[in-house]
Amino acid sequence: MDENKNKALTAALAQIEKQYGKGSIMRLGDSDVAKDIQVVSTGSLSLDIALGVGGLPRGRIIEIYGPESSGKTTLTLQVIAEMQKLGGTAAFIDAEHALDPQYAQKIGVNVQELLISQPDNGEQALEITDMLVRSGSVDIVVIDSVAALTPRAEIEGEMGEPQMGLQARLMSQALRKLTANIKRTNTTVIFINQIRMKIGVMFGNPETTTGGNALKFYASVRLDIRRTGSIKRGEEIVGNETRVKVVKNKVAPPFKQADFAILYGEGISRESEIIELGVLHKLIEKAGAWYSYNGEKIGQGRDNVRDYLKEHKDLAHEIEQKIRAAVDLAETNNRTVPPSPSE
């Protein structure tokens, strides 16, 4: 670039920064832009790996969808618990009016510090979300769920009265407002969504999510969560086998998937993942029913090894860090500390 053009560009950039604030425009190669993406762990080691960056990105919109009882709310509560461990503030917009505080507490959420709102309609829910995001003091906001964001006009209208596209228009308008503030304040906003069936689809996938197409475009990450089986101890069912597919990912290669166990009353079983991934990467040796680490036996049968790792948390952490090193994934704790409101 010649000198005159360079001077003109420098003056234009200075004027833009003066008028709209520092950081309103910058070169992509600047250190502030090119630094590692800040993330928060999902609570699942295999899902952190599948996401490619070690967790869910900060300052982005995330969509988690799946059938009923597939683990959508459990996964988001696990993310909230991980954020709270880092000293972050979390808010839960309970549009379904179905949050169980006791269950949330069991899987590690500090319910005393959790902000909760049970709005009367969709407009109120999204206005509250926008105000929390703009405050810059909340690190994660979860909306449960898009399907329950009923527009005010629909609530006030007659039962059975057609209300074409109201919810889709509401979501589209709200996401246009939210996006810039979410990025500026580095807030993670997670929308939980439900699945519906398209009528008359002969070929292809008949499934679709509620709330129109806007969320599909604005979301940086979309996760499809499904229950794939049951976990039994004897005759008793104690949990679900769960599979999450990364359907969309703007921060790493998409289309990867993660399999993990959700245990009733406990949430995602981190120890089960460490066993499975440890064996896969030859960090844990398996001979028959016995499992060994560094030549020492750590248990017979998965359940016993899981209990052993629960009791020996330092050992579990050591194996986890070796797994992260094996898949070239940095320890997320270095990149997940929430910024202070002044930053």
From Swiss-Prot:
Sites where the protein binds ATP: 66-73
CDD domains in UniProt: RecA
Protein name, as recorded: Protein RecA
Gene Ontology cellular-component terms listed: cytosol
Subcellular location as annotated: Cytoplasm
UniProt keyword annotations, A-Z: ATP-binding, Cytoplasm, DNA damage, DNA recombination, DNA repair, DNA-binding, Nucleotide-binding, SOS response
Any one Gene Ontology molecular-function term assigned to this protein's record: ATP-dependent DNA damage sensor activity
Protein role: Can catalyze the hydrolysis of ATP in the presence of single-stranded DNA, the ATP-dependent uptake of single-stranded DNA by duplex DNA, and the ATP-dependent hybridization of homologous single-stranded DNAs. It interacts with LexA causing its activation and leading to its autocatalytic cleavage.
A Gene Ontology BP annotation from the UniProt entry: DNA repair
Pfam families in UniProt: RecA, RecA_C
Species this protein is from: Nitrosomonas eutropha (strain DSM 101675 / C91 / Nm57)
Main subcellular localisation: cytoplasm
Family: Belongs to the RecA family.
HAMAP family for the chain: RecA
